[in-house]
Amino acid sequence: MRLLVCLVFLASFAMVCQGHSSGYTRPLRKPSRPIFIRPIGCDVCYGIPSSTARLCCFRYGDCCHLG
């Protein structure tokens, strides 16, 4: 009997981990805001003007440290 209870628990836990809840799975929702693609200057900060670095910092939150 303990083995049966353990197997049922493990099966239900596996279903929860896979996203099943009460036998119904909802479709994935789209993100509420659009995903912006960052310009390459935000990731590679060598040789870009300081105004571009500031723009990336304000718009995308990626602050380039020029040095």
Swiss-Prot record:
Disulfide pattern: C42-C56, C45-C63, C57-C64
Recorded superkingdom: Eukaryota
Leader sequence residues: 1-19
Gene Ontology cellular component annotations, sorted alphabetically: cytoplasm
MF-aspect GO terms: chitin binding
Keywords: Amidation, Antibiotic, Antimicrobial, Chitin-binding, Disulfide bond, Fungicide, Signal
Subcellular location: Cytoplasmic granule
Modified residues annotated as Leucine amide in this record: L66
Pfam families, per database record: Penaeidin
GO-annotated biological processes: defense response to bacterium; defense response to fungus; killing of cells of another organism
Similarity comment text for this entry: Belongs to the penaeidin family.
Entry function: Antibacterial and antifungal activity. Presents chitin-binding activity.
Protein name: Penaeidin-4d
Native source organism of the sequence: Penaeus setiferus
